[in-house]
Regions:
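C-terminal motif of bacterial Sec signal peptides marking the signal peptidase cleavage site
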Residues: 17-20
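Bacterial N-terminal signal peptides that target proteins for export
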Residues: 1-7
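Amphipathic alpha-helical protein-interaction segments enriched in hydrophobic
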Residues: 223-234
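An aromatic- and glycine-enriched ligand-binding surface/loop that stacks and positions planar moieties
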Residues: 22-94, 170, 228-229, 240-356
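Conserved, well-structured interaction surfaces
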Residues: 39-50, 56-67, 87-167, 184-223
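TPR/Sel1-like alpha-solenoid repeat signature
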Residues: 153, 232-238
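Aromatic- and acidic-residue-enriched carbohydrate-binding clefts of CAZyme catalytic domains
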Residues: 178-188, 259-268
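Classical Sec-dependent N-terminal signal peptides that target proteins to the secretory pathway
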Residues: 11-14
Length: 356
């Protein structure tokens, strides 16, 4: 009798478990709520979310080497800021982000933010999907779609720029992406040469200038979005690097060893003066936009406390000391002209030195 009751209990429990498992495994109701790619890009809100996600990989692993840290200054895009309290020449125990460490080449692939490679390619993938699908949106004007596409194209090329600076020659992924269900041998993408990556960045940034709708932005809420000026500036940077001795006629031992899977040199062994000409022309394109200029504060004799002291006369500098701006500094305050860029006096949208 006891055995029969025991078997009955097991049967009831088993049926309950099967019923529970059946409910648990019945996930169809959840998949019905999932948005398809086509449906996602019909909504402007979802379009903006996707674009923001594509940009999100610029943070974290891709902080500039001179960014002090996530809590102090996590959105610094400058590559020339310097923090003395993180310099091993001052304190040997504080070398986490020493500018000198990078300036002097005292680092390796394991030194700083080793996750940058994966983060960049994730961003590249998200931007590529966006570029191929944003035209589906019916809630945006044509000019908005074009501008958003230009922003995505900019950030995709910007990720390649970050990769080029950090790793040198890298694989350029197919624009339409890859079929991850195929074998590794079918989807493996070899490294492109340094020149090819730089040229890709140049071409993509040039295309972005045809899509982006602003030379520079004057809205403080949109100041972080890329512009034609930003695209042309990154293009100029990439071409300057490609023209440099590192990638232009480099026959050092390491350059000879840097080859792809078929033995092709990835750093050019032949010097080309034309590369410098292209880089100079690209820099000129930024200047010719005529939307950027140095911030100038006029010379002052007033003494209104710490915020405005009389102009300190700089050391003599030949003819520059005797002429008004822009040929000299006799009518400006050089110190305050520089300081007001960083002390909060000028909002980002009003800072005509700010490109991106």
């Amino acid at each position: 009798m006891i055995k029969k009751i025991y078997m009955l209990l097991l049967t009831v429990l088993g049926m309950g478990a099967i019923s529970s498992c059946s409910d648990y495994l019945n996930s169809e109701k959840y998949f019905k709520d999932r948005l398809t790619l086509e449906k996602t890009f019909e909504s402007k809100d979802h379009v903006e979310e996707w674009l923001a996600y594509a940009f999100s990989f610029i943070k974290n692993e891709n902080y500039e080497v001179t960014t002090k840290g996530p809590s102090e200054n996590s959105f610094c895009f400058s590559d020339d800021m310097y923090y003395g309290d993180r310099d091993k020449t001052i304190d040997a125990t504080k070398n986490e982000l020493s500018y000198n460490m990078f300036k002097l080449g005292e680092y390796d692939e394991n030194t700083y933010n080793v996750g940058a490679w994966g983060a960049c390619y994730k961003g590249i993938f998200q931007a590529s999907v966006f570029i191929h699908n944003v035209d589906r949106c019916q809630e945006m004007a044509d000019w908005e779609i074009l501008d958003y596409k230009g922003q995505a194209r900019f950030v995709r090329a910007y990720y390649y720029w970050l990769l080029l600076r950090r790793y040198g020659p890298v694989p350029i992924m197919p624009d339409e992406g890859v079929d991850y269900t195929q074998s590794y041998d079918q989807i493996a993408t070899p490294r492109s040469s340094y020149e090819e990556v730089a040229q890709y960045i140049s071409d993509e940034m040039l295309q972005a200038t045809k899509e982006l709708q602003y030379d520079r932005r004057t809205d403080n809420y949109a100041i972080g979005r890329p512009t034609r000026g930003a695209a042309l500036a990154v293009r100029a940077y990439a071409l300057i690097f490609a023209a440099s001795p590192f990638a232009n006629g480099n026959n050092d031992e390491y350059a000879q060893q840097l080859v792809d899977d078929e033995g092709r040199r990835l750093l050019s062994s032949e010097y080309s003066e034309e590369k410098w000409a292209k880089a100079a022309a690209a820099c000129r394109d930024v200047i010719d936009l005529d939307v950027y200029e140095l911030n100038i504060v006029n010379k002052s004799t007033s003494d209104n406390g710490p915020s405005e002291r009389p102009t300190v006369t700089p050391p003599a500098d030949g003819e520059f000391s005797k002429q008004p701006w822009p040929k000299g500094w006799t009518n400006i305050d050089p110190l305050r002209s520089y300081r007001t860029i960083f002390d909060g006096t000028i909002l980002p949208a009003n800072n005509k030195e700010l490109i991106f």
